[in-house]
Amino acid sequence: MAQLVKAAQAGFDEKNDALVTVEPIASGIEIELTSKVIRQYGNQIKSVVLNTVKEAGFDGVKVIVQDKNAWDYTIKARVLGALERGSKA
């Protein structure tokens, strides 16, 4: 399993994008989501984040997503970018 060594961010807090922050935690995967469309798409966004973290082989990660109506592929790219930045010392 891959591990984060530091907190990191990817993305922008702008329309049609997402700002994703990852932080190392002891174990597991925690997701904190802020979105105007959380009622309609909250479960889908969380699923994309969770699957992306698992597929990348990470554990011990808190993912904070500030969504501004981003598409799934954008969220996935932002999560992967933040994980990559956070895994480098």
Kindly give the residue locations of the regions a language model identified.
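N-terminal intrinsically disordered, cationic/polar leader segments
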Residues: M1-A89
